[in-house]
Amino acid sequence: MKLDGYTRLAAVVANPIKHSISPFIHNRAFEATATNGAYVAWEIEASDLVETVANIRRYQMFGINLSMPYKEQVIPYLDKLSDEARLIGAVNTVVNENGNLIGYNTDGKGFFKCLPSFTISGKKMILLGAGGAAKSILAQAILDGVSQISVFVRSVSMEKTRPYLDKLQEQTGFKVDLCALEYVSELQARIAESDLLVNATSVGMDGQFSPVPENIVLPETLLVADIIYQPFETPFLKWARSQGNPAVNGLGMLLYQAAEAFQLWTGKEMPTEEIWQSLTEKYQ
């Protein structure tokens, strides 16, 4: 990597963030595309967020990525939001366009790009969970022309989830069905007629539990995806593969959301195949 007086900076901003693999991905991409850039991780306190955003302009940076807890907190300090960032109510990428700071959310696009030979337009989807990742997938699916979405959450989370779905319907005219995860017969009935089943909860990170009962029967054409990438194969994905279903983990989402951000910053395509190889060697 060449560092000189013309090197432009990009960073991921969060707390905690030292464990992030984003610097690995983006610095590989800068090198592979002969882009004079460097990508670092900044672990900051909330009180430093305003100054950090100001530094994007001050140092003529490409921009920044954001992770928890700053995806929502950054919004008041930006000049403009993309459609999907407005719908999600969260930003994971800030682009410096000649001093104008524009907020995007590339998580949903990254998720759908990582699915092999699959387009969501006209399809039926089941989403488990309603946190930040789920919201980005939900909003992107609506923008991309999904025909039906069923969101399943634990019954204790129903009331907390409903206002966001109501607001989404106001903004898009699209009605999302909200169901309780405990109603297994309802889950089975909806899975039977769906094209895509997504785990957007953290259940499975421990390598022990699955978010759905193992007696659920999957239709053979159903694509199953998990946003978790460590462990590389969660119990949820193992269960889906044992029924013969295609199953995808969250590492591709991480790579392709980064590729979207890289293109917004540099105008260049990230060499995803090359970087995917390095990532799978590192995490498989």
Curated annotation (Swiss-Prot):
Catalytic activity: shikimate + NADP(+) = 3-dehydroshikimate + NADPH + H(+)
Protein name in UniProt: Shikimate dehydrogenase (NADP(+))
GO BP, one annotated term: shikimate metabolic process
Annotated shikimate binding sites: S20, I21, S22, S67, N92, D107, Y229
A GO term for molecular function: shikimate 3-dehydrogenase (NADP+) activity
Protein function: Involved in the biosynthesis of the chorismate, which leads to the biosynthesis of aromatic amino acids. Catalyzes the reversible NADPH linked reduction of 3-dehydroshikimate (DHSA) to yield shikimate (SA).
Binding site for NADP(+): D83, G129, A130, G131, G132, A133, I227, G250
PANTHER family per record: BIFUNCTIONAL 3-DEHYDROQUINATE DEHYDRATASE_SHIKIMATE DEHYDROGENASE, CHLOROPLASTIC, SHIKIMATE DEHYDROGENASE
SUPFAM superfamilies attached to this UniProt entry: Aminoacid dehydrogenase-like, N-terminal domain, NAD(P)-binding Rossmann-fold domains
Alphabetic keyword roster: Amino-acid biosynthesis, Aromatic amino acid biosynthesis, NADP, Oxidoreductase
UniProt EC number: 1.1.1.25
Protein family according to the UniProt entry: Belongs to the shikimate dehydrogenase family.
Species of the source: Streptococcus pneumoniae (strain 70585)
Gene giving rise to this polypeptide: aroE
Active site (catalytic residues): K71
CDD domains: NAD_bind_Shikimate_DH
HAMAP family: Shikimate_DH_AroE
Pathway the protein contributes to: Metabolic intermediate biosynthesis; chorismate biosynthesis; chorismate from D-erythrose 4-phosphate and phosphoenolpyruvate: step 4/7
Oligomer and partners: Homodimer.
Gene3D superfamilies recorded: Leucine Dehydrogenase, chain A, domain 1 (3.40.50.10860), NAD(P)-binding Rossmann-like Domain (3.40.50.720)
